[in-house]
Amino acid sequence: MIKLSHLAKIFATPQNSVHALDDINLTIEDGDIYGIIGMSGAGKSTLVRCINRLEKPTGGEIFINDTEITKLSEKQLRSIRKEITMIFQGFNLLQQVNCLRNVCFPLEIAGVKKQEAEEKAYELLELVGLKEKALSYPIQLSGGQQQRVAIARALATNPKVLLCDEATSALDPNTTNSILDLIKEINHKLGITVIVITHQMNVIERICNKVAILENGKVVENGTVEEIFSEPKSEAGKLLVYPDVTKEDELVVESSYSLKIRFNGAEAANKPLVADLASTKNIYANIAYASTKSIGSKAYGTMILSFASEEEKIIAQEYLKNTANIIVEDLSKKGE
């Protein structure tokens, strides 16, 4: 388990002081895939560098299991860091050696014999689907393949925690998804705790079970992915989860007979509610606004429907109320 308690980091300049992290409190359980998301400058990378103590916090505490690491000596930190590994946006592979030697590198530093290191490296390259590329050089690989080698290298020392700092930002969407699926598979197979630093909500949506949203160095919201997606409370959360949510008010005024439907984990990700209304009640709704996401088989988000008359709106409201995990709000009464 990783616990951050009142963590702070201040960068001092001749002109002023920048609070990169301000009173961060988070608990990351063993086996979590924990997403940390925010816009540029939110403090994400500073936070991850504090977790592995590449950056020394200004204040607060960091517990790795039961060990508080902010006051450890460099020698003590080296022992802790063996349990924490990291992959980056830029892969950071050694270009002058092949993939096998890249994966062997941390093992050789740790004093593992060459034959044993190579056997382990081949196993890891097979795990990431690149055993046949063992003797290829990084320049001969695609970006996604290079990141797979970087992941294999990161796993060489049997870490308990994998830090991913914008690990898919430089990749195309299809390659991004394949890398995310690999990380999720590694989490399940090896039980490694994963911390994902990203500015992309689709990354959180695809693999994370929990998420914290950072803004100006502060955690403005955290919880399970389902909780945050169903009803983000902070302005930063709303902007990240549903970036076009501000359009709601502009669209509502176009109809006096409107309902706001909030999907709160409904088993309706693939259920055609509007089509069902038409077929069962002979009511044809206009979709004035929709911003929804599917996580697993569940739907989260908001939809605004407008109707031709008050009578149609009331019938639709009664019908929709019978669908589990859907909250229906009569927008025509909102201003009364």
Model-derived features: where do they sit?
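Helix-to-loop junction immediately C-terminal to a conserved catalytic motif
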Residues: N52
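Short coil-to-helix segment of the ABC ATPase nucleotide-binding domain corresponding to the Q-loop/switch region
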Residues: V97-C104
